[in-house]
From Swiss-Prot:
Similarity annotation: Belongs to the complex I NDUFV3 subunit family.
Organism, scientific name: Mus musculus
Transit peptide: 1-35
Superkingdom of the source species: Eukaryota
Modification Phosphoserine occurs at: 101
Gene: Ndufv3
Organism lineage string: Eukaryota, Metazoa, Chordata, Craniata, Vertebrata
Annotated Basic and acidic residues bias: 38-50
Protein name: NADH dehydrogenase [ubiquinone] flavoprotein 3, mitochondrial
Chain spans, region Disordered: 38-68
């Protein structure tokens, strides 16, 4: 049904028809009403407990300009080659199909 309405050029009508069929509007209205009542309750609670707001701690300032874990990144020119040499003894031989590999 929505496709036929879109083909007629009435995109707004088609969207409205799809949303009405899916019953989106009534659900959204209920959620808006729920949110408004919750915000009223929280405002009343804030008036009753003004001390809890002043007790909240401020977040600690963080220094993101330096990396703290320096031993984790200890690279030099031969790091990859050293690791490659150390791990080469644990590598398994590659399976062979019996044919020679193509030369490019």
């Amino acid at each position: 049904m929505a496709v036929s309405l879109l083909l007629r050029g009435g995109r707004i009508r088609a969207l409205k028809a799809v949303l009405l069929e899916a019953r989106v509007f009534p659900g959204e209205l209920v959620s808006v009403v729920r949110l408004s009542t919750e915000s009223e309750k929280s405002a009343k609670e804030k008036e009753l407990h003004p001390k809890t707001q002043s007790v909240l701690k401020e977040p600690e300032p963080t220094d993101t300009t330096t990396y703290k874990n320096l031993q984790h990144h200890d690279y030099n020119t031969y790091t990859f080659l050293d690791l490659n040499l150390d791990l080469s003894k644990f590598r398994l031989p590659q399976p062979s199909s019996g044919r020679e590999s193509p030369r490019h």
